[in-house]
Amino acid sequence: MVHFLVADKDNPGSICSSLHCARENARTLREILPTEAWELLNEFFADCTRNVESAINKRTRFEFLKRIVITLQTIAGMLDGTMNRNDAYTFSMLGRNLERADMTSRIVDVRSAQLLPAETPELRPFESVQWMSVLKSLSGYQMYRLKMRTRVKRTDVLQFLLRDDQFPRSCQFGLMQLERSLTDLPRSEGVLDVLGDAARFIERAPLTTLDQPGLHDLIDKIQLHINNVHDMIAEIYFPSRNVGGARPLLGQARSQGQTQRQSSLSFGEAAKA
């Protein structure tokens, strides 16, 4: 399983495959990207390729993955701090925030499904510890405590990760940033309408009354709304990707939207738009 997620070149979602695609996209756009960011990405790709086996070894896996996180955050900081605020930057922000909103919803879904049932009285004391681990999965524990100033509770965590308008990795914050980017682009009215539908759905969700199956169903619908936003962006700004011509609707399978998101809103193609 670890090899499949980290090193399998036949898995387009593995870390190594993702790094390879990122490097290829960046290589075609070297005249647009900051030189320091391209050099760091290139060196990092070579380093990961040489040392990928350290991710398979339990003793060295944590350091390998930690280095990936730190390096990618460094590259993101370079792009954010040095790129001109032009169309290339705008489309890169579209891709970043769309992916953030989607991944936050997926992490909440998967991690919450693994939690022990709080309905069992003897397990209730452990509920806050479990939801604390969900926050830490998104590097959100400290920001949650600063914002909520209370102990970790299920409803508050869901409110923070799905609706908060200040935490950069919340779903709602990602949608807000998408709106800001889209207002700088032509022909964005249709996307803004679909984006508004997604934001209203999250804002009106009954978080306080959801059981675990209800939360899973809610996350599914959030992801489908996010897929609709992606599909509309792809339809308007990347029409060559929509071979069939029709935009998938809310009730269709979300896997199609996830696959398209990896291809059509990659940084390299976004910068070419």
Model-predicted segments: where are they?
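Alpha-helical transmembrane segments and their helix-helix packing motifs
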Residues: M1-A273
